[in-house]
């Protein structure tokens, strides 16, 4: 599960996109289709994790004069005479109650003077512009801290007119993005029950708190607390859930945190997320630190789940380094590749390296397995799905394990995820049945 720089911005854009797009429904799998025994890729969401996702990372590059314009708009929230000078002469505003485009500064001012019954704050999430014009993505928000609520999302175009910044276009969307709510072990077990799945591997998101994509106080303490919370939640359902701890493997405290996880006794393995840590294996220092973590996990007999995509350029060379330089450091434990090829957008070149290494019986791949969470949706096109299945068969169906990823932040729940795989991948019924029945070695020990 990846949490990146501006989750609220992404959710705001999803809301805006829903106004003008169509979300395709997922057809149900045939009633006779098998049900997975285990979900090998799941997450919980702690209260501190939900707070992290719900805290917007504000744009820091907004020009002071634009910020002043936003503050003036807030101050004039119910007064058209104060709002009118803030708009360009030919301003256009989408009337979400229409929908229709309102034209002119007077119409825009009168519309927004009536739109809000209580004061609001404009929280800028992204800005791009020059000295003459710019575009802003923002939230309409009220309250502070846990009491804050996002009442709407907005896209704006701003221009300089008569020597001052003015609003030229406003595209508001209501309601605003929904704040994430914690997902505890009881809720996850209920989702598993609804899907008919017996067990799940719960991967801590402690690595969020050591990620450069978030700014948190005392990241080591917060990572430790997240790992502990995950273990305590999983311990409530020992017959259903298994916990993996997590950390940033290139942090200075990685080996200390790993040792704590190993001594805890509540963890079966370790989750590493190269993307959240901005890891680039082509950098010698990154490679050295990750190798040390692999070796330490092997010594502690902790299985490893790795989200291997560290950046947009992830491909064959990174996959070769993982096979040739990381897997040999963990020869005695299971290493599970997350999301089949390593996460996010389909990376056929990386997957080809993994498949060919296994087909060639590379000695480091003896305990190398793959979960298929998000595989169908990320593949995208039928052509990509066909190529994906070709690579899956080269890897071997016996090395493929069902996973669904977190049931929050827009991800489907375990049942819907399995249905999406059944619909999106051109595997045979026999192959789906084999995947559904596969149970990772670390759960059989």
Regions found by a protein language model. Give the residues of each.
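Surface-exposed, charged secondary-structure patches
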Residues: 92-93, 106-151
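Active-site gating/metal-coordination segments in enzymes
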Residues: 198-199, 207-312, 317, 374
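Short, low-complexity N-terminal intrinsically disordered segments enriched in polar/charged residues
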Residues: 29-36, 54-76, 81-85, 168
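Catalytic pocket-lining loop regions of alpha/beta-barrel enzymes
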Residues: 268-269, 282-401
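A short gly/proline-enriched turn/hairpin at secondary-structure junctions
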Residues: 48, 92-102, 115
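Short beta-strand edge/turn micro-motifs at domain boundaries
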Residues: 151-174
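Mid-to-C-terminal alpha-helical segments outside catalytic/metal-binding sites
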Residues: 36, 52-54, 81-85, 164, ...
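Short, well-ordered alpha-helical segments enriched in acidic and aromatic residues
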Residues: 69, 79-96, 435-438
């Amino acid at each position: 599960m990846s949490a990146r720089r501006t989750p609220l911005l992404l959710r705001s854009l999803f809301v805006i996109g829903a106004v003008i797009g169509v979300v395709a429904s997922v057809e149900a799998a045939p009633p006779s289709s098998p049900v997975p025994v285990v979900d090998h890729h799941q997450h919980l969401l702690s209260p501190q994790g939900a707070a992290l996702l719900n805290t917007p990372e504000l744009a820091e590059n907004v020009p002071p004069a634009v910020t002043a314009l936003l503050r003036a708009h807030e101050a004039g929230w119910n007064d058209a005479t104060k709002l009118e000078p803030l708009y360009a002469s030919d301003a256009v505003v989408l009337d979400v109650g229409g929908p229709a485009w309102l034209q002119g500064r007077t119409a825009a001012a009168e519309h927004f003077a009536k739109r809000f019954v209580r004061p609001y704050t404009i929280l800028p999430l992204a800005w791009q512009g020059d000295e003459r014009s710019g575009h802003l993505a923002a939230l309409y928000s009220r309250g502070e801290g846990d009491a804050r609520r996002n009442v709407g999302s907005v896209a704006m175009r701003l221009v300089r007119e008569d020597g001052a910044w003015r609003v030229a276009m406003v595209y508001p969307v209501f309601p605003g993005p929904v704040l994430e709510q914690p997902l505890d072990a009881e809720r996850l077990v209920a989702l598993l029950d609804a899907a008919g799945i017996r067990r799940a591997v719960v991967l801590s998101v402690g690595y969020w708190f050591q990620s450069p994509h978030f700014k948190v106080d005392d990241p080591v303490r917060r990572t430790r607390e997240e790992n502990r919370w995950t273990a305590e939640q999983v311990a409530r359902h020992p017959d259903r859930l298994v916990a993996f701890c997590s950390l940033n493997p290139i942090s200075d405290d990685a080996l200390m945190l790993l040792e704590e996880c190993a001594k805890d006794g509540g963890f079966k393995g370790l989750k590493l997320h190269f993307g959240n840590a901005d890891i680039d294996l082509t950098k010698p220092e990154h490679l050295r630190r990750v190798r040390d973590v692999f070796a330490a996990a092997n010594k502690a007999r902790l299985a490893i789940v790795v989200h291997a995509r560290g950046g947009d350029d992830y491909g064959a060379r990174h996959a070769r380094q993982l096979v040739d330089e990381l897997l040999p450091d963990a020869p005695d434990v299971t290493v599970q590749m997350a999301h089949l090829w390593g996460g996010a957008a389909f990376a056929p070149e990386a997957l080809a390296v993994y498949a060919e290494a296994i087909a060639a019986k590379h000695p480091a791949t003896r305990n190398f397995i793959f979960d298929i969470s998000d595989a169908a949706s990320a593949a995208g096109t039928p052509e990509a799905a066909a190529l994906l299945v070709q690579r899956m068969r080269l890897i071997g169906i016996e090395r493929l394990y069902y996973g669904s990823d977190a049931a929050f932040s827009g991800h489907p729940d375990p049942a819907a995820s399995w249905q999406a795989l059944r619909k999106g991948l051109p595997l045979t019924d026999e192959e789906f049945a084999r995947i559904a029945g596969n149970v990772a070695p670390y759960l059989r020990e």
